[in-house]
Amino acid sequence: MAGGGKHTPTPKAIIHQKFGAKASYTVEEVHDSSQSGCLGLAIPQKGPCLYRCHLQLPEFSVVSNVFKKKKDSEQSAAELALDKLGIRPQNDDLTVDEARDEIVGRIKYIFSDEFLSAEHPLGAHLRAALRRDGERCGSVPVSVIATVDAKINSRCKIINPSVESDPFLAISYVMKAAAKLADYIVASPHGLRRKNAYPSEIVEALATHVSDSLHSREVAAVYIPCIDEEVVELDTLYISSNRHYLDSIAERLGLKDGNQVMISRMFGKASCGSECRLYSEIPKKYLDNSSDASGTSNEDSSHIVKSRNARASYICGQDIHGDAILASVGYRWKSDDLDYDDVTVNSFYRICCGMSPNGIYKISRQAVIAAQLPFAFTTKSNWRGPLPREILGLFCHQHRLAEPILSSSTAPVKSLSDIFRSHKKLKVSGVDDANENLSRQKEDTPGLGHGFRCEVKIFTKSQDLVLECSPRKFYEKENDAIQNASLKALLWFSKFFADLDVDGEQSCDTDDDQDTKSSSPNVFAAPPILQKEHSSESKNTNVLSAEKRVQSITNGSVVSICYSLSLAVDPEYSSDGESPREDNESNEEMESEYSANCESSVELIESNEEIEFEVGTGSMNPHIESEVTQMTVGEYASFRMTPPDAAEALILAVGSDTVRIRSLLSERPCLNYNILLLGVKGPSEERMEAAFFKPPLSKQRVEYALKHIRESSASTLVDFGCGSGSLLDSLLDYPTSLQTIIGVDISPKGLARAAKMLHVKLNKEACNVKSATLYDGSILEFDSRLHDVDIGTCLEVIEHMEEDQACEFGEKVLSLFHPKLLIVSTPNYEFNTILQRSTPETQEENNSEPQLPKFRNHDHKFEWTREQFNQWASKLGKRHNYSVEFSGVGGSGEVEPGFASQIAIFRREASSVENVAESSMQPYKVIWEWKKEDVEKKKTDL
């Protein structure tokens, strides 16, 4: 979407704006077995997958029809829900006068006999108001009507969009509407009640349904002082079934009654998942002149600014004045019972943490101290936690921004097949420079064919542009472009939360600042700095660990660790920061005392039995990552550091005993880290190669094989270890002399994918191929049906076997299968040093022995150097009367360390081959078979 004009919200976006996290979508797969994805496939297969969506809202649920796409089923369910709610997307087209009239009509209906027994939360408030005593009997606080009733609140926003952030405006519009119902409604300065009493039979009937389950109850809440210097404290509310809970809250705030209490929107979550609200005093300016919310004097404005509660306003996104109480208590749909949950100081800090992109990620990973929002999205398989697009949507919802608009586009990009030719020589010592140059070129022009870009635009609810993010990079997959653009936007927003988010020295992504722009720096306001509850003296991070070693785990690896973090007072320092006195006579006594003090001054704040993260993307606390990358699997490490001031809010967000943690934070504490490295998965072979080669090595290998197929005029081809059929599928994209293609593999899943791809292409495209067959079998077994073919291929397969099995395959394929031409490729182990950057400069500085590079894939059983590969192929060819030619793809054979993927071409020299009876040995099972004559016959029959 170009420009900043209005866009029509989708049904799902409207549901999200109305209900947020309370709207739960569950999509189920519906398989259509009546249709077949691939005729002739011997493996049991599912039909096309369809989707049905179940949408659960607080008061009801709906089920969509069946659709081919998940998103269509979700939109359908949302549309059904809107119909059931009576919400019309065109409500935004209402005029201000029409909105005012609808508020009047809605208030009249709320105080009708019919609505008194409604299952709406406001109905429960009305019934509770009838149990109030004295002049308050039947009086409903005006803030309840303005906040709890969604229809009234939405109409108030039509009158003035500022209602979104200023709830007091909604109160004024409700009071103005009530003034037009003087014959029906009695309006006090703070509440509304019906002029004529409800019929006695209705009231008596309702009285019999009052729950006795809540006689009196203490509910934990959080008291947030207006003055920033004062500490946020745990508080207690006393609520009961015979008293309106707002009167109890008013009592704690020092107010006359609940009519003077302002209620915020729902936000955040308490310990058990219930959402919270803020309760505060309606500013006197509004109490004294509630019928007119405009035209404040300078004196009034000054008072309101001074009374604004910055911390409370920040966590709910609305203007809160005076002291406030954070609580989870209120009425829900379809219930007369008061719903409540304890809210702790820990809950308050978790809500604060969850307002930022980094905090959302931390909480979702259940690692508030250890985890960090990554600064790079590499692959979906390596990403842990919610995806960037999901986090961005949640962030926008929390800050009352419109749904992000993501627009993907494709564009042709030029080839980079000559990248290596531009570098005369690649040396191990020049790895970093080479990587930097190649990476820079890769970002601008990612490869042959088409690439994807994604643009993100974020608007306010009133359609003011907040952020436009247009990354220049292209990506091979559309989802990668979407996730990277979303992450860019999140990183831009993260700059506003530096004081809340940063754990020590966190790197920032500043390479693409030119990709993002904002129409005004004031559109999105930075959050208030949380008051440092202790000394504001700067704290330097000191990691006390063993001497720094060489990094042994490469970037792109996914590691699994077990860790625990504890807060402890350093026994070497007294509370005033001075070293303890030395007294030889009392050393033993002091040592015992320090040991006891240390033991009693340790608080476990966070632990995780197993968590995974990708190295080199900033997804983990830098101190943890730095230590882990120097470890080996099974190794245990521990170290300590002094937490920076910015980490105090995070520590309070995870600690269970806030009082004790605050006490420790005042005693110059340190963070004790204990880490066990459970496992390491190296960066994927595809990713490492993609960082250096465009087009990818896999495509270069296919092109190399095609060249020899054309030169040999082969008519039959067998792909040994065909996997998902990528080579066979690619062969159909080019004109060749091939008439018969065969694939062999031991993976039924891979063969099924191959069959589906080949089935589609062979039936749609005109080509010379007359037959195609896929076999389930081991290439270590001989099958006479594959004897004496024109060409055999075995690309990047043998390294997945044991080394002796690879040698066995070589013997059998040349002695029994006896192809005229055989192409075998395997990784060049010597090239791994460049791909993995496994020789950092610090090795020379530390005079340590160079580390051996790792295999390119965790599934590889071995990888050969050029010498090993040459010896294997040469001896094999000599024994079986084959000439051998060596080549490769990726890089150059004339410079060190040779080709990235080394290739041997075996050519049969003997003109005559012994005949083998076709039925003599046939261990392979036919999984799928296609014949051109069968297809043509069916067409003729039709």
From Swiss-Prot:
Species: Arabidopsis thaliana (Mouse-ear cress)
Region (Disordered): 505-542, 571-596, 837-856
Disrupted-gene phenotype: Reduced organ size, altered rosette leaf shape and increased number of coflorescences. Urydilation of miRNA 3'-ends.
Main location: nucleus
Any one Gene Ontology molecular-function term assigned to this protein's record: metal ion binding
Top-level taxonomy: Eukaryota, Viridiplantae, Streptophyta, Embryophyta, Tracheophyta
Expression sites by tissue: Expressed in stems, leaves and inflorescences.
Family, per entry: Belongs to the methyltransferase superfamily. HEN1 family.
UniProt xrefs under PROSITE patterns: HTH_LA
An annotated GO BP: leaf proximal/distal pattern formation
Role noted for this protein: Methyltransferase that adds a methyl group to the ribose of the last nucleotide of small RNAs (sRNAs). This protects the 3'-end of sRNAs from uridylation activity and subsequent degradation. Can methylate 3'-end of microRNAs (miRNAs), small interfering RNAs (siRNas) and trans-acting small interfering RNAs (ta-siRNAs). Involved in plant development through its role in small RNAs processing. Required for the specification of reproductive organ identities and the probable repression of A class genes.
Cofactor binding note of this UniProt entry: Binds 1 Mg(2+) ion per subunit.
Name of this protein: Small RNA 2'-O-methyltransferase
Position of the signal peptide: none
Residues holding S-adenosyl-L-methionine: S726, D745, S778, I779, L795
UniProt keyword Metal-binding present: yes
Residues that coordinate or bind Mg(2+): E796, E799, H800, H860
Gene name as annotated: HEN1
Record EC number: 2.1.1.386
